[in-house]
């Protein structure tokens, strides 16, 4: 019986300490105000896999299957 009382007291103490600790709150409104740090890599770049791009002499990989 003493073990049950001791376990209950320790459990309640742990719950009380956990409730007293500050929680990390996520501020959703702040996330919308942050600047966007993602970069669109397709913007402004020519399509390297396009056949016209390779025929114009702009092929940066000359041995891509032709060697």
From Swiss-Prot:
Subcellular location, record wording: Secreted
Signal peptide range: 1-20
Keywords tagged on the record: Blood coagulation cascade inhibiting toxin, Hemostasis impairing toxin, Platelet aggregation inhibiting toxin, Secreted, Signal, Toxin
UniProt motif (Integrin-binding motif) ranges: 64-66
Stretches for region Disordered: 35-67
Effect on the protein upon substituting residue 63 to S: Abolishes the ability of the protein to interfere with the binding of host integrin to fibrinogen and platelet aggregation
GO CC annotation terms, alphabetical: extracellular region
Tissue expression per record: Salivary gland.
GO process terms (BP): suppression of blood coagulation in another organism; suppression of platelet aggregation in another organism
GO MF entry, a single one: toxin activity
Biased composition (Acidic residues): 35-54
Effect of residue 67 to S: Abolishes the ability of the protein to interfere with the binding of host integrin to fibrinogen and platelet aggregation
Function: Inhibits collagen- and ADP-induced host platelet aggregation by blocking the binding of host integrin alpha-IIb/beta-3 (ITGA2B/ITGB3) to fibrinogen. Inhibits the intrinsic blood coagulation pathway in the host by blocking the activity of host coagulation factor XIIa (F12).
Domain notes: The Arg-Gly-Asp (RGD) sequence serves as an integrin-binding motif and is required for blocking host platelet aggregation.
This protein's name: Ayadualin
